[in-house]
Amino acid sequence: MRNYPLKAVCAVLMLGLSACSSLPTSGPTDSAVLEINQGADASELAAKVNVIELNESLVQQIYAAQQSQRFSGFADVRGNGGYAGAVNVGDVLEISIWEAPPAVLFGTTFSSEGQGSGHVTQLPSQIVNKNGTVTVPFVGNISVAGKTPEAIQAQIVASLSRKANQPQAVVKIANNNSSDVTVIRQGSAVRMPLTANDERVLDAVAAIGGSTGNIEDVTVQLTRGNQVKTLAFETLIADPKQNIVLRAGDVVSLLNTPYKFTGLGAVGNNQQLRFSSSGITLAEAIGKMGGLIDTRSDPRGVFVFRYMPFAQLDSKAQQEWAAKGYGNGMEVPTVYHANLLQPETMFLLQRFPIQDKDIVYVSNAPLSEFQKFLRIIFSITSPVTSTTNTIRSY
């Protein structure tokens, strides 16, 4: 009879041990994450997770890719300077021709106004056609595409010199339709003609009336040919080198996209947190989450979960993941691992950038899980021990 309570305690302990796997926890352990794509029982998604250790080479590579988004890195295939003042297809030209008296060609043919001792004739406005030409009376079609107004003036005078009396010409671009920039903002879009003033990115932002959103949430996207770069509005304002001269055909877009990441695990705050479009580092993200909880966290198990666009992988990685069924337009599930027990990792945290929709997870320490188990065991065995003592007292 006296062994019965002891057997009951042992039975409760065995029951507690069998329930170890059911202990409440905030997420997987560090070993579970690191071995996610290993083992025969790995799910189809888990088998395709890319687990990457944080190291100096990787951080430098990611940092360089982030710097490549700066507008100052645009390749300028047109040489220095912006708008060159050249006429092109679609432009509207106004041509005025002077002829000294006595006027030979332009005396009565067109409506004109006297001006001093000369005679000026204003030709009807003309749109440069697809062939790049306009028509001038007594000259015919002349090629103007790619030429400046001054060059066209000289061309007209040379063509009329043997027909008119001391001709002079003035060519003006009335509407610059071929050299403009498209500026887009939510609910609004404008076309900004380029001039010899060399308009820059911030001029385009001003042309559309600036941003309507919080400056911390706004990014500026510049599309030039096949290149697309996105930069935080704050960075564009703070760094004059990014306020580059615009080119004909550029598209400037103001995007109001609040950036967020989610903090989970053994950290001070398990929640979704916003950050500026200028970005934050992993070190700053951990600080925003309230840091690691001393009594729970495993500093060896700091992870960043992210979907990485296939196109952003290097050529070697693309070949590896293409063999697993990935291709352009797809995203590779990626986990970055940092071990904070290694002092050099602290420097890497200050360069590793957090991206929109990232999950930053800190695993629980093994000792923390064991302490949970002990609390459960003691909460179960205490009433049994009390009962045993009561029975023995009889």
Curated annotation (Swiss-Prot):
This is Capsule polysaccharide export protein BexD. May form an ATP-driven capsule polysaccharide export apparatus, in association with the BexA, BexB and BexC proteins. May function as a membrane anchor for capsular polysaccharides. Possible porin properties. Keywords: Capsule biogenesis/degradation, Cell outer membrane, Ion transport, Lipoprotein, Membrane, Palmitate, Polysaccharide transport, Porin, Signal, Sugar transport, Transmembrane, Transmembrane beta strand, Transport. One of its GO terms (biological process) is monoatomic ion transport. The keyword Transport applies. Residues 1-19 form the signal peptide. One of its GO terms (cellular component) is pore complex. It comes from the Bacteria. PANTHER family: POLYSACCHARIDE EXPORT PROTEIN GFCE-RELATED. The keyword Transmembrane applies. InterPro entries: Poly_export, Poly_export_N, SLBB_dom.
